[in-house]
Amino acid sequence: MTIEFTDWPQDRAQRYRDAGYWIDQPLTEILHSRCQAQPQALAIICGERRFTYGELDTLSSILASRLAEQGLGQGDTALVQLPNVAEFYIVLFALLKAGIVPLNALFSHRRLELTAYAKQIVPKLLIASREHEVFRDDAYVQAFAEVGAAPAVTLLLGESDPAASLAHWIETPGSQPVAYAPTAADQVALFQLSGGSTGIPKLIPRTHNDYHYNARACADVCALNAHTRFLCAVPAAHNFLLSSPGALGVFHAGGCVVMAASPEPLSCFALVEQHEVNTVALVPSAVALWLQAAPAHRDKLQSLAYLQVGGAVFADSLARQVPGVLGCQLQQVFGMAEGLINYTRLDDSDEQIFTTQGRPVSPDDEIKIVDEQGVPVAPGEPGMLATRGPYTFCGYYKAPEQNASAFDAEGFYYSGDLVVLTPSGDLRVVGRIKDQINRGGEKVASEEIENLLVLHPEVTHAGLVAMPDEALGEKSCAFVVSRNPSLKAPALRRHLMELGIAEYKLPDRIRLIEAMPLTAVGKIDKKQLRHLVSVENTRTWLQTRLRQLIEDSEELDPEENLIFYGLDSLQVMKLAAELKARGIEVSFEELASTPTLASWWALVEARQKAA
């Protein structure tokens, strides 16, 4: 029995085999080959614990055998949620060896997400941590049963009862070894999670062949080798940290993964120094924190050679700081759990590295950039990204409607990204088509949050849009129409938390409005909501900037002439130039003719609306 999925057309599959991309070996071969070549080499450092490749192989085999003893194997699925600990990889290889297909949930996911995943895959096995709020008591049993997904076997990290203790099952062999085997190389190895725009992420079946090549190709582009010490500080379950090149790429190259609980700078800097880490992969929001903290701790980062940044668009202004502040080489990454991975190369020019998201890692990655009618756009013009290739999937799991809209007749997958092809052949990401917020690499589906907000008894309408943020790339802003004009933002966030959503999905900003703007066909006018965000952000920026320029500006009266606060002509010229740099076309003469904050707000809003 195998997991159903949409396979590659035979002609393309044969082409990928002929080119050597697909080698018809299971992902377990990554570990097996390392054990043959260097069984005593360090594979994982986790706190005070060390695991060689031989030990990783032995422990994962014990767990695989014990799971097989329970009748689990090919055709079964597992829901796994573990923090950044060595057990994550022990469990992963055990499941791959036993032919059990895992879905690795992020540790930030809560009851709502976990039960939705369980409903989709109906797992026979659940592996989680007592440290997580959902599993601190046994109420989760009923929650899973209510969605028709009660696992046959549950193993918990931190559980005291040996019968359900993950640690006990890993360390204690069964009464007798039981045979097990991975699924075939052209079958599903694991599920990844999409950054869905319609609520709970869709599931992405990844086969051994395509995922193995994904990790190998990225490892080659990033020049990983047996001397690589890779810091895993972003959630290990992320596709970025698992296979792009991530831990699987490091294991393929014979390097060592150093586990970090989070990307918090000071604790990570200590790990870099202690273990001579030379490579790290981070999302832009984490890099921003590292850049702030690094100047006072530069001596701890002497071994750091490479920084891979992905998960969200990395601002040029931050990218340019990396070599000087962190003392390492930057590689930008633009990838997706569905497949296509782009990297800047180690020998690219500074401008390519700082201002683009690189180019595909495989010679057989096919991309096209098209307009809304599917016509290719001119070079340098923004368009929708479509792709297919040897590690880009061919369909979401049991989702025919979504697949019909996500793929064209030629099998190209439309990611929802707006990109520009630069003269150097690199991609620059300029936006998204999907109704989704990319918050520091974590994807938030607007529709999901809107549907949950209107469950509040005092909310009649809700709309969620992205707003720009230098550190995170994007934050979320919720516009809410309420029956109660005194409804406060904390009450709405409390309502969302009580529904069991992940904390990163909470709106960063909540604004109550009298009426929801609608399009001609009665849908929420997201363009108008984004305009409201832009106007508010500009108002806030303008007021803050004036306070920086004016000495006596504690209480700025919007109707008072700013000259009487001490603002001079040179400062007005500077403001006009700064507004122009923000894309707002106003002249010095226009500002000088009506020098009040209220007039400037009105002028700027009119220009933004016109634009």
From Swiss-Prot:
Cofactor(s) needed: pantetheine 4'-phosphate
Please give one Gene Ontology molecular function term for this protein: 2,3-dihydroxybenzoate--[aryl-carrier protein] ligase
Name the record gives this protein: Pseudomonine synthase PmsE
Fetch the PROSITE patterns from UniProt: AMP_BINDING, CARRIER
Q: Name the gene that codes for it.
A: pmsE
Give the pathway annotation: Siderophore biosynthesis; pseudomonine biosynthesis
Is RNA-binding one of the keywords?
A: no
Biological processes per GO annotation:
siderophore biosynthetic process
Q: What is its EC number?
A: 6.2.1.61
The family assignment reads:
Belongs to the ATP-dependent AMP-binding enzyme family.
PTM annotation (O-(pantetheine 4'-phosphoryl)serine): residues: S569
What general EC class does the enzyme of this chain belong to? ligase
Which ranges carry the Carrier domain?
533-608
